[in-house]
């Protein structure tokens, strides 16, 4: 927990810097690849994901360490060659886990958040799930376990492998010559994120594209068919927590409503998007059958509400960093409570960004939650008062001002409509 949190303290500012550089480069090139609300949603999704991971809120069905202890044929030392083997096996496992999440109904709920943006930029890379509460990727790593690759090697390689998947979420880099034959490049991953029928469910590779070429899921990007980003059933919200349960809730309702007992069972394991015929007829859902039909979600928040949400995001990030810096000194109960407050904060300001009629109520509950935590700590905020006197009550004052600002924004006419941004062809 603590080691991962410290790694994130270093990695997250680096990611944010790259996102800023990409946005500046796109602006200089005259390309529209970002929308404010979409970026807030993406970054907020990343916050919820890392909080879940740092708190260890995942049930491991079977661990790699257990596999090594029980099925290893040989015992080997951690040489550079072993690290290379571990990287390749981890990438192989990632390919199959990724493919499973795309092609099986129940597992799509774990991954839909990552594809829910109707843009494609570096901030989209941070759209990660909180609904992947079980882990069984180790089942795809049996070859490494049989060879006796030490668990500590996998633990070392895993975050490197994960962070290395960030850079290719961009429209600003064209095709990369000979690297296209071996590595996952921005061009390959643009295809993966596209909703075009030709591109759908292709290019599952995470670092190496060779798995797609071996297993028949490779598709090159075509100049004649620019990718259109998003999902076939648009999520229509900026709230990452709602996105994380949308597909699951649809499956639950369909399983309940169908008259067929067989359909109640098989709906979970059918190809993604499958619905019982009787339910699909009685309860149709919005679906984009052609990229030409896509109308990008826009809640028309206006510039004032966007500024309010950006400021809320900035404060939430700052509080998250304080949690990560203090995580080794706090009892787990306090860490859990702190993490819950951050998640509630994300839920609140993204609900406001959707211009939901419940946004003020949710913000009131968040402020009450935060102030009660400060009161219990005698006016402090998890040790921050040692560096910033009156930190707790100062935070309370800021939250009350945010609440007052939201009440005022809700009482004014909505902002003028934001312009739709073109899909845009990749830079050649």
What are these regions (language model features)?
Residues 1-15:
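Hydrophobic transmembrane alpha-helical segments in integral membrane proteins
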Residues 2-5, 56-75, 138-154, 158, ...:
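Juxtamembrane "helix exit" motif at the C-terminal ends of alpha-helical transmembrane segments
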Residues 6, 10, 33-50, 332-340:
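Loop-to-helix transition at the N-terminal end of transmembrane alpha-helices
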Residues 8, 119-124, 167-309, 358, ...:
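Cytosolic/stromal cytosol-facing helical appendages immediately following the last transmembrane segment
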Residues 20-40:
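Membrane-interface helix-loop junction between the first two transmembrane segments
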Residues 44-59, 78-241:
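Membrane-embedded catalytic scaffold of the fatty acid hydroxylase/desaturase
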Residues 297-415:
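Substrate-recognition/cap regions that form aromatic- and gly/pro-loop-enriched pockets
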